[in-house]
Each structure stands twice: as structure tokens, then as C-alpha cells.
Amino acid sequence: MKRQSIAAALLALSAVAGTASAQSVQVIEAGLARSTGDKPVAIRGLLDPAPQPNGKLLMVFPGWPGIPRIELKDGRPSWLYLQQHVQELKPLLHQAGISVMTVDCPTDQWGARGTNPTACDDSYRSSPLHAQDVRALIERARQAAPMKEIYLMGHSYGAVSSHWLALHLGAELAGSVHSATQSVPGGGAYSGYASSTAQIKPEQLPKNSIYLHHRDDLCRFTPYEFARKQALNGLMTVVGGNRWSDVCGKASYHSYSERSAQVGAALVRWMNEGVITPLIKGEGD
């Protein structure tokens, strides 16, 4: 993405940056069998369990820059950013018994801290190693809480992960949803970001792999047409909402602004009932 788009997106997400005050939110960490110098590598997730969990976990891979830098600081969960609209729809998921975990890149893929990534690009996200790392995190999450069914949701650049993990993890997953998929590479220094998405053919994806996208998404890196063509197994199309921010930012069609409640309800129906909502809209749409 362009630098101005990235900066706007991070400003939009600043409301959920920082440290956790809720006692239920916890950092889940899985040690990995490799190191960077003398530092052991780990992959972490920020787990927010439902008050009355039904055994289903939605693992979220956030959009640009895609590296939330989840860690413990002074014994408290800390992060660079979280996906704003996921935070907005999370109460609906929790009410339905669904727990949520934001997934980070492993620490050897953090790169430089900031608004533009220098690591965790498609060469890692498309690799079997990524699947191996996420599998280790799933195992640790299951030790922390009873999780029977694992679902993935990748948003924007995070959908690169959800695509490849759907292929590599297969039957280990109950389902995957690719939200506002970035299918156009960033270009320039970011040519390695979203360069692999178009390599995946629709027929390669499992039957439980579906798409979620706003029909009028104006972010040039995430065209709706890609989702429409790829979605052999199901497409949930969002209409209406707000587009006052940067087109790739918080208050935009790209982030389902003013449609997060409807998107949350559709996700609950899909995860708990297996029902795909073809058109997600608000009153008056």
C-alpha cells in the first residue's frame, strides 16, 4: 500500500493500540524450534475468550502492516495495533459463544517497528513454515481453553495468510473467511506483499473457505472483483456504510464502517449454523 494509506490506517487503529486492562485477555505464546542469534523465536496471539465459550475460536490475521507485535510488558498484554472493525463486532461473537484471537507474526518476522513492514511478507506467509508456526499456536491455545473448532479470518493483507493456511492446514480448520482480500501487490519496496494471492486457484481452496468483501470497496489494493471471481464456495457481500476516511482506512467501505454489527451477525450465522449471508446490509440499503 502507499505510505499515506498505511499511515491513515494506523491512525484509524490507534484507538485499539496499547495495553490491555481486561483481565480475561491473555497472551498465548508458542515457542518455535529456531532462534535469531541467541534469542529463541516465538509466535503469539492475543486471546479474548467468550464469557460462555462454545468451543469455537476465530483466529484473526489483521491487515496492513500485519504485524501487531503482541507481547507482555510488565506482566500485561501489549500490542502495536488491532483490527478496529473486529474489535467492534467482537461483542456479537462473544455473545454467541465464539472466542477471538488476534494472531501475530513470529518474532523473527517482526522486522522494524513502524507503519510499514520490513518482514512477514508473502515469502513467509505462503510457506509451509507459516502453517507449522500457526499450528503450534493453535495447540497452545487449546491448552489454555477448550477449543474444538478453529476458524481463520484474514482481513486485507492478512487474507494472504488465511488463503495459504486454508490450503496448508486443510481439514485441521473448521473454516476460513477471506475478508477484503488484498490481491494487488503493494509495489516498489512492497512488491513482495500480496504478490502470491493471485497464484491460488479457486478450485484449490477447501469447501469451507469463503469470502467477505464490500461491493464498493474503494481501496485499490483490494478490488471486489477478485473475491467475486474466487468465491466458488461462498461470498458474503457487504453494501452501504461509511466512506469518510482514507479509502483503505477505518471509516471506509474497506473496513465495513457502520456495518460491523451486520458483518458480525453474518459471521455468527456462518460459524454457528453453517449459513452464508449473500448480502449484508443495513436499514435502508
Could you say what each language-model-derived stretch is?
Residues 22-53:
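N-terminal cap/lid segment of alpha/beta-hydrolase-fold proteins
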Residues 51-92:
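Short, surface-exposed "cap/lid" segments of acyl-processing enzymes
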Residues 60-63, 102, 153:
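Structural cue for short, hydrophobic secondary-structure segments
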Residues 85, 90-111:
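Conserved alpha/beta-hydrolase
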Residues 85, 113-144:
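Alpha/beta-hydrolase active-site loop
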Residues 139-204:
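Primarily recognizes the serine-hydrolase "nucleophile elbow" in alpha/beta-hydrolase
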Residues 175-240:
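The feature captures the conserved acid-bearing segment of alpha/beta-hydrolase catalytic domains
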Residues 233-285:
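C-terminal catalytic histidine-bearing segment of alpha/beta-hydrolase fold enzymes
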